[in-house]
Amino acid sequence: ETSPEDIVGMQVSQGILTVRGGMTSHAAVVARGMGTCCVSGCGNDNNVAIDYDAKVITINGHTFHEGDWMSIDGSTGNVYEGQIATVASTENANFKRFMGWADANRQMKVMTNADNPRDAQNAVDMGAEGIGLCRTEHMFFAEDRIKAVREMICARTVEERKAALAKVEPFQEADFTAMYRIMGERPMTIRYLDPPLHEFLPTKAEDIAALAADMGMTTEELNNVVVSLHEFNPMMGHRGCRLAVTYPEIAEMQTNAVIKAAIKVSAETGKMITPHIMIPLVGEVKELKFVKDVVVKTADALIAAAGVDMKYEVGTMIEIPRAALTAGEIAKEADFFSFGTNDLTQMTF
């Protein structure tokens, strides 16, 4: 199965095939968002064997080596040996006409999820009227920035953490700049760092040793950090807004990147960019207020220094039951709400 750490490989894949999983698994959800063909949960340990060292996979007695062709059908879940001839899908004329009638009469805007400039361009091409969720953590896994992210996580002092964040900020700013150029004045809601930190750390011994050497730590010291950050229950653990409460410099860095990008694109295009900043996993109004204060202080200083008149909004996602129950109090500090129905459903039932 896949995890957030696999996002770079998934982005360059022509198709995704996993042994474990289903329609709502990580592989299926991410592939659907990227428009990549995916078959998730194709079997079990009895009919699928994977030799990672030899780069060989055996499915129901059929063996595939690295470089061999296989074809997958995301609609039926079928997996075929060899390369099957395909044609690009086309938009049905009757469907296009029907959707035109719907567009002429609807009163609801349809947005999409997009985590990078490529997704944003696809969204615009497909007629999306905005980005309802941009998950910034997916930007962190790129090969050119994951090292700095890991240095930030394993930092022993605030100074070390800020130095690592200073390396990450230009990458985030570049991503947001590219996305704002594509989206123009269409709304884009940017969710701050959400997953628990252990998801960004290396798991292979050689990667841990390399990171330890880069940071001037022993492998044992770094292993202790990795173990200390491991979450017993990642859904409810040290993640979301709790990361920004513990390490406000993370929220400060992300605010720098968002606002600088918005100011730059507004100046370039003359369009009014209004950043929508989402603080994730809030369950109590004090959490939102703490992080919002960091965001507002940072954003206002940047806007004043640039001498521009820029509006921005700070909101949150209602995704845990406590947030739903205290929504009236949270609303006093939030400019907007989004609903995270997947986590909310799992925590409720």
Region roles according to the model:
Residues E91-R97, W101-F349:
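Conserved alpha/beta-domain cores
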Residues E1-C134, H138-M152:
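Acidic, glycine-rich flexible loop/linker segments
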